[in-house]
Amino acid sequence: MKKVLVINSSVSQLNNSDSLAMSNMFIEEYKKMNPNDEIINLDLNETKMSQKTLTRNNIAEYFNQEDSFDFIEQLKSVDKIVLNFSMVNWGIPAILKNYIDHITIANLTFTYKGSTDGNAIGLLSNIQDVQILATKGGTGTPNSAFTEYVKNIWEFLGAKVKSEIIINEMMDIPPYAEQSPIENLEKVKEQILKAAKNF
């Protein structure tokens, strides 16, 4: 039995989130293939930690048991991650950045000890795959920089990102702007179902 951590970092309302709809479809299909796996849900909108931004005024107490170490222990206990988010001002949501800052800690999730080439050694090698599900605006906005950043972070921490990144785009222009998240899934439905079966 595998443990799958599903991280929701969409800042849209639950009934209006395209990236959350992607995640829900993915997990629904995944559970059909893996009914005995444990699914753990983490909504960053509902955690105190993800509301805290690192500053010079709070750095002394920023990394603590409740906000950092408990979440790191969770990461070390799971086998796979499904992460959904949308592009916000050409970047990732602040709650996801705050989460990343809280769990990226030397000698806990990465280390330089034992490195022979000066590169960090990731300590989250237990994570066999990270599935990234993202949404963005029209084709005029950058397509991959925001997802590549997230991919690079997980790989830096030792996790494997074997699954293809799935991006559902053009959510803010007609006809997609008038459609429900479920309707907007049609463009990437086959990608999602295939990825879930191979995850």
From Swiss-Prot:
UniProt cofactor note: Binds 1 FMN per subunit.
Entry-linked Pfam families: Flavodoxin_2
Sites where the protein binds FMN: 10, 17-19, 135-138
Catalytic activity of the protein: 2 a quinone + NADH + H(+) = 2 a 1,4-benzosemiquinone + NAD(+); N,N-dimethyl-1,4-phenylenediamine + anthranilate + 2 NAD(+) = 2-(4-dimethylaminophenyl)diazenylbenzoate + 2 NADH + 2 H(+)
GO molecular function list: electron transfer activity; FMN binding; oxidoreductase activity, acting on NAD(P)H as acceptor; oxidoreductase activity, acting on NAD(P)H, quinone or similar compound as acceptor
EC number in record: 1.6.5.-, 1.7.1.17
Keywords, in A-Z order: Flavoprotein, FMN, NAD, Oxidoreductase
Gene3D superfamilies: 3.40.50.360
ATP-binding found in the keyword field: no
Entry cofactors: FMN
Function, as annotated: Quinone reductase that provides resistance to thiol-specific stress caused by electrophilic quinones.
UniProt record similarity statement: Belongs to the azoreductase type 1 family.
Assembly mode: Homodimer.
Listed name of the protein: FMN-dependent NADH:quinone oxidoreductase 2
Organism, scientific name: Mesoplasma florum (strain ATCC 33453 / NBRC 100688 / NCTC 11704 / L1) (Acholeplasma florum)
